[in-house]
Structure formats: C-alpha cells, structure tokens
C-alpha cells in the first residue's frame, strides 16, 4: 500500500502516556507522579536586593509561575532569603521558592540555617558542588541539610558545567574501546550518569526518592531530546525539563518549544522552565507565558482562554482584525487574575477573531464566541457567533468595545457564581 493511502487513525489523537515518576512535594506543589506539569521560572534580580526580588517573584507568581527559583550565590543573598520568603507570604502568595546553589552551597546552607529553612527546594549542580576529594563531602553536606529541613532537592546537571572528572573517565574508556562512540554521545552519557550517580549517592545518604527531581540541560535541541529520553528510560525520578541558554526572542521560544514539545509528547517531563534571555528592559514574565502557552497548545493544561486568529492575507489588507486580536488577547490576560477567582473554568473559554469571510464564520462557529471581521471589498459588518450559532452583527467604529462587552457577558453567564445554562441566555439584538 502506498504510504499516502494509509487509513486515518481512528483512535484519539494525543501524547504518549506520561512517564511514571515518583511524586515530589515542593512546598504545596506536587511534581511528578501524574500531577499536572508545573510551570516554573527564575528571577534575574540580585537576591540581596530584598524588595526588588520580592517584586519580581510576585510578578512571576501572578503571571502563573507555580515555583520560582532564586540565585543564592553569596552570604548577602543567603541572609536575604528569609526576608524574601516572609515578604512573599505577606502578599498572600504561597509560591514555593527554590534556592539555586553553585560552588559554595554547602557553606551557605550551613552558616545560614534560616535560609535553609526558608527555601522549599535546593538546586544542586553536581558539576560544581565540589572538586576532587571535596566533592562527595560537600555534596553530602547539602543533602544532609535537606534531610534535616525536610526539603526537596533538584540535582541539575548542565552541559556547560559538567563534572569534568566523570567526563574524562568516560572519554578515556571510549578512546580505549574497539568501537568508540561519537564524542557528543559520550558527553550525553556523562550528563545522564552525572545526574543518576548523584541521585544514587543522595539516596545512600538518606534522601528519599520522593524528595528528588532530576534535570540534565544542554543548549542543542537534538542533544537535549536524546539526553532526556535516556534519563527517563533509566529512572523513575521526577524530571525537570529545560533547554539551557535557549537565547533571545523568537529563537529562544522556537528552540525551547521544539525540544520540550517533543519530549512532552513522548510523556517525558513533570515540570518545565522556558529559559529565555530577556530583551533589555524586557518583561521577565514572558518565560512564564510561553511555558503556559506550550502546555495549553499541546492540550496538557489550560491557563487562560485561547484566542484563535487568522494570519492575514491579501483579503485582509486592513489591520483592524490584527488590532482586535491583540486587544482581545491582552484584555483577557489583564483580566485573568480576577476572572480566575470569580469565574471558575473560564480558562477553558475559546475565542476567535477572524479577518475575512473565507474561514471567518466557520472558525468562529468552532469557538465559544467568535467574530468574523470584513475583508477587503466585503460588506462592512462583523457577525458574532456564540456556541456555533450566529448571534449578532456588529457595525460601526466601536466593534472592539462591543465585542469585549459580549465576551464579558458570555463569561458572566457561563462561568459566574450562578451560571445560566450556557450562552443561550444571551439575547441576540435585532439585525
């Protein structure tokens, strides 16, 4: 049979079953073990700047980050952590705070016990936790402090700071092999072994599996996919996904989405971070938004109402539909913090903003509420569809405001405290 003649799948399209992992509680957030995939982020403030760090953690949390990591790189930062935790809690936020430690984490956690107690999770990099004969001792020091404080730990190997002793050992063994592997393959193996050997050592010290999350980050998409596939096949630890040094703007978004999307589709990953390099003066919350959009687009979770909009073509020379799509999308994101508490389930809403008669009415009918704006040469009228039925036609200079009002009406009737049976209660205006 010609490959193009294969029958259509009759099963439900969707990702592979989730890789079964051991659930870890980070504060009050469940990671792994079948829990929803968690979106996390990281601050870029000087942690010693208590007020600045509180402000950014709050912004990230309100944008939807379910865990936030902060750098703890020196004594001033360690001393600031309890004050940051207290400030966040005073704002009514319970977002778990993760401490990111490199080189001197053992020293900071030991000398600043209030810091060790205030954090919800410690991140250890096995490539720089200690060197030569100090490595095992300093690693054990951090693990023992985690056990004492009942904290979770992420053992995070990174391509850029890989354990050089382990890498050298594997490279030497490979060179002596009758069938040597590619150097990149050996480096990937070193990444996986670094994470797994460190996890095994932590268990020997007494840290249970339900307190450990593993990651193995690289900056090349294909290598990242291979590393995490291998890591998942060889363990059942909870897994943190992320493409390190993804880059700025669209490049960073595309690279992270390509790598993480493939792994998530294969059932791999319990928590994700989109590591974007922000534009100068850019909004740090962008990485949270991208992470949410990735999970929502793939059907894993819902965070905000989806706005479908056509890309535009020669039939849509007017920018009206583009401006309306942007306006509606921004409007929804701005209102979501309030809507989330007032209208449970509103994140499942689908909105369509289309630009001409070709696909506009059809796409709008598939949405809960949609509008089809007139294309070039078409009658200057914008039909609105509600739950698949034509509801009203908008005209004039206030189409954007009128459509927003209809969206609000729909939300109030569908998701309000005493919801009416769907949007059918919305009364169409006379045409």
From Swiss-Prot:
User: Which parts of the chain span the membrane according to its record?
Assistant: none
User: Which cofactors does this gene product need?
Assistant: [4Fe-4S] cluster
Reactions mediated catalytically: (2E)-4-hydroxy-3-methylbut-2-enyl diphosphate + oxidized [flavodoxin] + H2O + 2 H(+) = 2-C-methyl-D-erythritol 2,4-cyclic diphosphate + reduced [flavodoxin]
Keyword annotations for this protein? 4Fe-4S, Iron, Iron-sulfur, Isoprene biosynthesis, Metal-binding, Oxidoreductase
What job does this protein perform? Converts 2C-methyl-D-erythritol 2,4-cyclodiphosphate (ME-2,4cPP) into 1-hydroxy-2-methyl-2-(E)-butenyl 4-diphosphate.
Residues involved in [4Fe-4S] cluster binding? 310, 313, 356, 363
Q: Positions of the region Disordered?
A: 1-20
Q: Which family does it belong to?
A: Belongs to the IspG family.
Give a yes or no for keyword Ribonucleoprotein in this entry: no
Read off the lineage from the record.
Bacteria, Pseudomonadati, Pseudomonadota, Alphaproteobacteria, Hyphomicrobiales
- Name used for this protein in its record: 4-hydroxy-3-methylbut-2-en-1-yl diphosphate synthase (flavodoxin)
GO molecular function terms noted in the UniProt entry:
4 iron, 4 sulfur cluster binding; 4-hydroxy-3-methylbut-2-en-1-yl diphosphate synthase activity (ferredoxin); 4-hydroxy-3-methylbut-2-enyl-diphosphate synthase activity (flavodoxin); iron ion binding
Which enzyme type, at the first EC level? Answer: oxidoreductase
Reported EC number(s) for this entry are 1.17.7.3
> NCBIfam families from the entry?
ispG_gcpE (TIGR00612), PRK00366.1 (NF001540)
Q: Where is the composition biased (Basic and acidic residues)?
A: 1-12
Keyword Protease on this protein? no
